[in-house]
């Protein structure tokens, strides 16, 4: 015999509610994968130069003096198409890619930004310097001479709920590293 | 009230154990499928704000297949098959002298045929993580230090875990409540 009481009604209601919420979360999570938003960029990054010199940062590699590089670039990229109702943030970062004898793939973030709205995702920057404090650009072998790097804009889309997604634009031309000659003191 | 028979009590306890062991088996299955000892972790600090807040649940994947370099895997393929750690991925790693794993973003990646080294940084931190490493470690190693790569996340649910840790009394209240519910609950005839 089924007793129709407030307790039973409440139990049935919350049971149904949790089931519906579960499926709603599942639908939101998987629609983000099936209905993924793409952006096609046409040469978003132009690099003026990449220069390096010997320096020392208190927080980088235990304050040991070594070679650090800095990049000057223009950026013209519209990532507002990545945004939909489930998008929370878009994190963009400029990645230097190059090969060495020891590692076929070296990738270093030299600049990044967190975009919090579609308007903010329309980026136009001129003569911007890479952030050498947050991303000290040193080399594994501590030798930049003779190396060339391409620079690519990457992004990560953080949803309000569900799976993260990634993307990248086309790379720039190969840019050699130049040494800065400083006058002896 | 109907007298609770011994057999009925045993049946109720068995039912509760079945629920708990099902949850545990589900967790272990997810652990096996993702090749990750902790496929679900809770964010405990603010170093990855604004993307992740304290109390968010993160779902990890530690599979490391070798992909054709020319082909960039789609998000769907990354989720179904896994993928190697890439620049900008958010990884969970542990250090030898730190009990709690750290969730940060890969900002430097050095890959060779048999070894992958990387350096991480929290989005909300001003500098990278090298200063946090013990003296003997200059780079994180993919095989030895990385527990998994973040694939997805769910907001707020992890707060339950944090509350249970911060307020131990809640543990006993919850366990006691479960026990009482098990014994009191009537079976419909």
From Swiss-Prot, chain A:
BP-aspect Gene Ontology terms: protein targeting to ER; signal peptide processing
Segments on the Lumenal face: 35-185
Glycosylation sites: 148
Residues exposed to the Cytoplasmic side: 1-12
Presence of the UniProt keyword Transmembrane in the record: yes
Transmembrane portions of the chain: 13-34
Top-level taxon: Eukaryota
Pfam families with a match to the protein in the record: SPC22
Keywords: Endoplasmic reticulum, Glycoprotein, Membrane, Signal-anchor, Transmembrane, Transmembrane helix
General function of this protein: Essential component of the signal peptidase complex (SPC) which catalyzes the cleavage of N-terminal signal sequences from nascent proteins as they are translocated into the lumen of the endoplasmic reticulum. Essential for the SPC catalytic activity, possibly by stabilizing and positioning the active center of the complex close to the lumenal surface. Essential for viability.
Subunit structure: Component of the signal peptidase complex (SPC) composed of a catalytic subunit sec11 and three accessory subunits spc1, spc2 and spc3. The complex induces a local thinning of the ER membrane which is used to measure the length of the signal peptide (SP) h-region of protein substrates. This ensures the selectivity of the complex towards h-regions shorter than 18-20 amino acids. SPC associates with the translocon complex.
Entry protein name: Signal peptidase complex subunit 3
Species per Swiss-Prot/TrEMBL record: Schizosaccharomyces pombe (strain 972 / ATCC 24843)
Taxonomy of the source species: Eukaryota, Fungi, Dikarya, Ascomycota, Taphrinomycotina
Gene: spc3
Swiss-Prot record, chain B:
Keyword Endoplasmic reticulum: yes
Gene transcribed to yield this protein: sec11
InterPro entries: LexA/Signal_pep-like_sf, Peptidase_S26, Peptidase_S26B
Glycosylation sites: 114
Function: Catalytic component of the signal peptidase complex (SPC) which catalyzes the cleavage of N-terminal signal sequences from nascent proteins as they are translocated into the lumen of the endoplasmic reticulum. Specifically cleaves N-terminal signal peptides that contain a hydrophobic alpha-helix (h-region) shorter than 18-20 amino acids.
BP terms from Gene Ontology: signal peptide processing
Species assigned in the record: Schizosaccharomyces pombe (strain 972 / ATCC 24843)
Protein name listed in UniProt: Signal peptidase complex catalytic subunit sec11
Its EC number(s): 3.4.21.89
Top-level taxonomy: Eukaryota, Fungi, Dikarya, Ascomycota, Taphrinomycotina
Catalytic residues of the enzyme: 47, 104, 129
One function term, GO molecular function aspect: serine-type endopeptidase activity
